[in-house]
């Protein structure tokens, strides 16, 4: 009888110890679960922070892209405005530089007529002197406007001269030199108003 009681007491003690171990393990498991939950919560918060930072970074990059686009548009518009201003300035300069072109076209025929009149024989001294004064006045007026006679002696230059006739070249008159001026040529600064019409020596 006594042995049975002792055996039961031993079983009760073992059961109690087992229960305590189970409780302890349950407690540890609960703590582990809480740690996992806490870790998950922290990970979630970290993920939210990363997402927020990524969102802010994306918005910043988008804002920077828009700023660069606006800057590029401004630079293009600014460059275009500068080109327009430059072209307008060049056009004004060209107009100013060649403003006398129409004047020259109107005066040059009259100057040609005066030269032809002076070549006529039998002019009285007074008439000749009067024509020469008019001629000089016209030439000076043209010079003031930048209009000058093209030199037509020496070698023929197709940039300034127009050959309307040729003559045989010889020892005294080399080929491609000007023999005679049929009509004077004129230029306005660097622009040819009309080439000089000349007779040129050529090899046979």
Swiss-Prot record:
One BP term from GO: protein folding
Keyword entries, A-Z: Chaperone, Cytoplasm, Stress response
GO molecular function terms noted in the UniProt entry: adenyl-nucleotide exchange factor activity; protein homodimerization activity; protein-folding chaperone binding; unfolded protein binding
Bias kind Acidic residues: ranges: 1-23
Stored CDD domains: GrpE (cd00446)
InterPro entries listed in its UniProt record: GrpE, GrpE_coiled_coil, GrpE_head
Region listing for Disordered, in residue ranges: 1-65
Cysteine pairings via disulfide bonds: none
SUPFAM superfamilies according to UniProt: Coiled-coil domain of nucleotide exchange factor GrpE, Head domain of nucleotide exchange factor GrpE
Bias-annotated ranges (Basic and acidic residues): 52-65
GO cellular component, one term: cytoplasm
Compartmental location: Cytoplasm
Protein family membership: Belongs to the GrpE family.
Subunit structure: Homodimer.
PANTHER family in the cross-refs: GRPE PROTEIN, GRPE PROTEIN HOMOLOG, MITOCHONDRIAL
Function, as annotated: Participates actively in the response to hyperosmotic and heat shock by preventing the aggregation of stress-denatured proteins, in association with DnaK and GrpE. It is the nucleotide exchange factor for DnaK and may function as a thermosensor. Unfolded proteins bind initially to DnaJ; upon interaction with the DnaJ-bound protein, DnaK hydrolyzes its bound ATP, resulting in the formation of a stable complex. GrpE releases ADP from DnaK; ATP binding to DnaK triggers the release of the substrate protein, thus completing the reaction cycle.
Protein name, as recorded: Protein GrpE
Record organism: Streptococcus thermophilus (strain ATCC BAA-491 / LMD-9)
Biological classification of the source: Bacteria, Bacillati, Bacillota, Bacilli, Lactobacillales
């Amino acid at each position: 009888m006594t042995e049975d009681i002792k055996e039961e007491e031993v079983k009760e003690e073992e059961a109690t110890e087992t229960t305590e171990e189970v409780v302890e393990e349950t407690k540890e498991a609960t703590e582990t679960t809480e740690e996992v939950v806490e870790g998950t919560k922290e990970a979630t918060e970290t993920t939210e922070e990363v997402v927020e930072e990524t969102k802010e970074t994306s918005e910043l990059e988008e804002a920077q892209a828009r700023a660069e686009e606006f800057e590029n548009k401004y630079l293009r518009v600014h460059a275009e405005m500068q080109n327009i201003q430059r072209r307008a300035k060049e056009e004004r300069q060209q107009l100013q530089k060649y403003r006398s072109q129409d004047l020259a076209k109107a005066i040059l025929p009259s100057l040609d007529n005066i030269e032809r009149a002076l070549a006529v024989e039998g002019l009285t001294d007074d008439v000749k002197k009067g024509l020469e004064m008019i001629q000089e006045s016209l030439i000076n007026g043209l010079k003031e406007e930048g209009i000058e006679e093209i030199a037509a002696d020496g070698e023929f230059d197709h940039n300034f001269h127009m050959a309307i006739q040729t003559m045989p070249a010889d020892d005294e008159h080399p080929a491609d030199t000007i023999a005679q001026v049929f009509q004077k040529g004129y230029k306005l600064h660097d622009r040819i108003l009309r080439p000089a019409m000349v007779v040129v020596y050529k090899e046979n």
